[in-house]
């Protein structure tokens, strides 16, 4: 509905503080977006069965390792299927096969989703307007939204601007 769509868009305006994401990491331990200390945080919403994600995530990691990591940028990667389907084996395999161990990877269990619904808490899909994958956000050190729904090129250009460099063409 239009009101639902408006709610999703209003929940994450540029300049606003991003909603915290409290999920489980690959070791089944709680992990929070707000506890990730970095000058900039890239929040990447993705699905290991998404063809576009399979292409973009290795490219994202290459840019991260070549440039961003040296500027205290961290990547907080959120598994998007939300426990509806069990893609955990594919998720863990993709992380391992592509050596994405420098990132913080998180997911929600079916039970966590059910608890959020029972408490009428909005899902991360609502809070971050996730309608496709991959979806990339850039947050500053205080977790304010600097850019949202960015392409990899836009994200890299925005980083270059933040570091007072010339963006790529």
Task: Name these PLM-found stretches.
Residues 110-161:
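Thiol/disulfide oxidoreductase modules built on the thioredoxin-like
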Residues 31-60, 74-76:
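Short active-site neighborhood of thiol/selenol oxidoreductases, capturing the structured segment around
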């Amino acid at each position: 509905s239009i009101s639902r769509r408006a709610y999703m868009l209003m929940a994450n305006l540029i300049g606003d503080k991003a909603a915290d994401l409290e999920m489980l990491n690959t070791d089944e331990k709680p992990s929070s977006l707000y506890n990730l200390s970095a000058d900039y945080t890239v929040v990447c919403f993705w699905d290991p069965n998404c063809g576009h994600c399979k292409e973009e995530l290795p490219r994202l990691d290459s840019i991260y390792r070549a440039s961003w990591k040296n500027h205290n940028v961290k990547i907080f990667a959120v598994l998007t299927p939300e426990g509806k389907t069990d893609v955990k084996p594919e998720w863990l395999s993709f992380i391992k096969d592509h050596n994405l161990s420098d990132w913080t990877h998180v997911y929600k269990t079916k039970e966590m989703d059910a608890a959020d619904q029972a408490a009428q808490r909005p899902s991360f899909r609502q809070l971050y307007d996730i309608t496709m994958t991959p979806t990339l956000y850039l947050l500053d050190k205080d977790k304010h939204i600097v850019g949202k729904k960015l392409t990899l090129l836009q994200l890299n250009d925005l980083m270059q601007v933040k570091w007072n460099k010339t963006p790529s063409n």
